[in-house]
Amino acid sequence: AKVRELGKWDNTLIMFLADNGACPEQPNTTPDIPPGPVESYRTISVGWANASNTPYRKFKSTDYEGGIRTPFIAHWPGVIKPGMTNQVGHIIDVSATFREITGAKYPKEILGKKTKPPPGKSLLPIFKGKERKPHKEIYWRFNRANAVRQGELKVVRAGKSWELYDLKADPTETKNLAKERPKKTAELAQMWEDWNEDCKIRPK
């Protein structure tokens, strides 16, 4: 309401997104606290978490689509026309979007230390109804949940072995192609390992 009062509604960008799929932890962690306060913590158990992410596989803490494919809503009346898009975006794109819109520059140094340019591609072309050149690859890591997507191909590791899926033909990740395409699986898996090393991250 305040934005409307200021006459800035048409030129204000509002984004809403979820950070992961439904939470599979056991429910009633804080049964005596009603939902809402910071002290409350509501979860829905494995079964309902899986159902909540239908038709996608799995849930939060995994890098299957049920854990990482989430809603993203952007509202900017002066720029965005109502509609939907199937173009792929990622949380890393949010910073790049704001920097393009505002003209802000990412600092080359912070506290005297050189920085790496942050990953991400601006979502502004998508907001304007254009086709954006997609990411070459997108990477994920959460503890022992690992994945990298290249176009419509995606490798996922939930344990020791990498799995390969064609998201265009199989968005629910039910047909593991790793044995049929071992070279591609190994190629993408090595790309993830190289990225992980570059990030200086060690799996737990």
Language model segments and positions:
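Loop/turn elements at helix/coil->beta-strand transitions in domains of secreted/extracellular proteins
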Residues: K8-I14, K133-H135, Q150-L153, K184
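C-terminal structured subdomain/cap of oxidoreductase catalytic cores
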Residues: L167, L177-T185
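Histidine-centered active-site microenvironments of extracellular/periplasmic hydrolases
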Residues: K2-H75, V79
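C-terminal cap/loop subdomain of S1 sulfatases and analogous C-terminal strand-loop tails that border
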Residues: V38-E65, V79-Q87, I91-K168, W195-K204
